[in-house]
């Protein structure tokens, strides 16, 4: 069993039950899924760029991403409806815990001038969104093979009802929030 999943069952669940006075263990919020999305704007003129982004996301998450397509045509960006412009991966279960563990313990500390992630990135429904400026913070990415530095959005979807519950859950998991 994954280290974080075990920690959730043995330590985090009892701690949250006592803090928020839940009547049942099933009321305890948990991480439902993690969605990693990367936009590849230069895929409009360069189709190789999208292939590279898909390959990098596959290495980072261990799962093949879905290519996202443009919903509308935007003339200013030379974009037609249905053109591939990004990639996203939805992680659940074991892979989700492994990715989250890697993100918190390895990748985030590798960010330059890292002082913690913002406490304000909750959406009011208990979900947390995190922007990463470069894919190089992940250990799977080989620095020499990167053609272009790309960022990504990481959305952590929890079953928490409020932001306070979600913040406490992620703090217990070891998410480094700003002081």
UniProtKB/Swiss-Prot annotation:
It comes from Bacillus cereus (strain ATCC 14579 / DSM 31 / CCUG 7414 / JCM 2152 / NBRC 15305 / NCIMB 9373 / NCTC 2599 / NRRL B-3711). Keywords: Ribonucleoprotein, Ribosomal protein, RNA-binding, rRNA-binding, tRNA-binding. GO terms for biological process: translation. InterPro entries: Ribosomal_uL5, Ribosomal_uL5_bac-type, Ribosomal_uL5_C, Ribosomal_uL5_CS, Ribosomal_uL5_dom_sf, Ribosomal_uL5_N. This is Large ribosomal subunit protein uL5. GO terms for molecular function: RNA binding; rRNA binding; structural constituent of ribosome; tRNA binding. Part of the 50S ribosomal subunit; part of the 5S rRNA/L5/L18/L25 subcomplex. Contacts the 5S rRNA and the P site tRNA. Forms a bridge to the 30S subunit in the 70S ribosome. HAMAP family: Ribosomal_uL5_B.
């Amino acid at each position: 069993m994954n280290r974080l999943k075990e920690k959730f069952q043995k330590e985090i669940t009892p701690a949250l039950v006592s803090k928020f006075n839940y009547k049942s263990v099933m009321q305890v919020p948990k991480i439902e899924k993690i969605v990693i999305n990367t936009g590849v704007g230069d895929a409009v003129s360069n189709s190789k760029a999208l292939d590279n982004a898909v390959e990098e996301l596959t290495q980072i998450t261990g799962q093949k991403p879905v290519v996202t397509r443009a919903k509308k045509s935007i003339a200013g960006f030379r974009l037609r409806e249905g053109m591939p412009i990004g990639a996203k991966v939805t992680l659940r279960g074991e892979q989700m815990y492994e990715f989250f563990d890697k993100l918190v313990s390895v990748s985030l500390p590798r960010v330059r001038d890292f002082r913690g992630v913002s406490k304000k990135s909750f959406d009011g429904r208990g979900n947390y969104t995190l922007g990463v400026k470069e894919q190089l913070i992940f250990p799977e990415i080989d620095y020499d093979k990167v053609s272009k530095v790309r960022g990504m959005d990481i959305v952590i979807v929890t079953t928490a009802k409020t932001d306070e519950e979600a913040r406490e859950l992620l703090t217990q998991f070891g998410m480094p929030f700003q002081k």
